Amino acid sequence: MARHHIALDPGADIAGFRDAARRLLASQIPPDDVTWDAQGSTSLFGEDVAANAAACMLPRGVVEMIQDVVCHRDSQRYALCYALLWRVQQGERALLEVASDPLVHRLLMLRKAVRRDIHKMHAFLRFREAGAGRFVAWYEPAHFILEPVTRFFV
């Protein structure tokens, strides 16, 4: 049974996930002992979770994978990302190179869906003039991609 409940803001809360993951890893809390809630309810960190945890060194590919997967709408995205971090910190630094690993395969599928959604927004979103130098457009993304996509349109 999970002893630690981590509440994050709705959407893609990469900063909240990063902070929580650092504390959990510093306290050596395995993924099976953590539940993740992306509905913004109150966090119930256990007393044994370090309040201030140092940054951990991760392969660039792991960081990039997490940044993409956190944007997916899958309710298990944070649990999957933390499982990846846990295994990398336990010595599997080249884990992302093992495409046959079930965790890696699932993460790759989530990343692919997010990147496809980003591509569709880049390719198909068209702005129309709404008068007086104002432009409007409509696109309903399948995932939480608005933040990473905004740089493209600015």
Language-model features: locations:
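Extended, well-ordered protein cores
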Residues: M1-V154
